[in-house]
A protein has these predicted regions:
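GH16 jelly-roll
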Residues: 1-189
Length: 189
């Protein structure tokens, strides 16, 4: 996994307070200073990127609550593509809201088959307003959600590889690639 994020937060050493817990029982092993880099609260955000992934890898652009309070943990998924969903002329692009620990949100995430070559540059964006999200690819609306997180969020860009998923004929040395041309944000609308 390789990921860039625009904010960072951890609780005290040995606490269970921190960002993006991927399983129960995790504890802070190393405190980090809190960093609120680019953490918008509403507005328009876009990333122009391209990726080369295999069936065992994926790439994503999402926004996550900084989790300074457990309930500020929802996510806005602007683009999530698993390599196994890529065909010659299309891919399934996941968009929506992930509830996680935010009781004010409902899980509302889906993958849409889009005619797209993800190895070419495309602009993935979201217009984020109170109670509303509108997702776009290259300026075309691909989805809407009638809810939204109501707190600052950090941006996250990541490429993930899952070697254990490699097929018998797959090149085990293949390295996924995510290239970002720009990240752009317009503050609160």
């Amino acid at each position: 996994m390789s990921c860039v994020q625009t904010g960072s937060f951890t609780g005290p050493l040995s606490s269970r307070i921190g960002q993006q817990p991927f399983r129960d029982g995790l504890k802070v092993r190393e405190e980090q200073p809190t960093f609120w880099g680019y953490t918008p609260h509403y507005g328009q955000v876009e990333v122009r990127m391209r990726a080369r992934v295999t069936p065992r890898s994926m790439f994503a652009f999402w926004m996550s609550g900084i989790e300074d309070r457990p309930e500020r943990s929802g996510e806005i998924c602007v683009a999530e593509v698993f390599g196994e969903t890529i065909l010659d002329d299309s891919a399934e692009v996941g968009i929506g809201v992930e509830r996680l620990g935010d009781p004010a949100l409902s899980q509302e995430f889906s993958a849409h088959r889009i005619e797209i070559d993800v190895s070419e540059f495309h602009t993935y964006g979201v217009e984020w307003r109170p109670g509303h999200l509108e997702f776009t690819i290259d300026g075309e609306v691909v989805g809407r959600v009638q809810q939204s997180p109501d707190y600052p969020m950090q941006l996250m860009l990541g490429v993930f590889d899952f070697p254990a998923k490699a097929g018998a004929t797959e090149d085990e040395t293949a390295i996924p690639e995510l290239v970002v041309a720009h990240v752009r944000g317009n503050p609160r609308l």
